[in-house]
Amino acid sequence: MKNLRLKAARAALDMSQQQLADAVGVSRQTINAIEKGDYNPTIKLCVSICRRLGKTLDELFWEG
């Protein structure tokens, strides 16, 4: 399932996939795969992404 919330949060900060990837220590391809729903990130990576984007885990990753 695509993660449109992650993509929207990143775009709202005018941040590229590469900028987010650099900030959390992964490749741009990893961020792309997460946004496309092709990769299930570790909880550690989820937390890093949330901190960088100023969002909670619930806001970006959990269905509900």
What is each residue range found by the language model?
Residues 26-39:
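Recognition helix of helix-turn-helix/homeodomain-like DNA-binding domains
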Residues 4-23:
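Short basic helix-loop element that most often maps to the first helix and adjoining turn
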Residues 44-59:
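DNA major-groove recognition helix of helix-turn-helix/homeodomain DNA-binding modules
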Residues 12, 51, 61-64:
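Short, charged recognition helix plus adjacent turn
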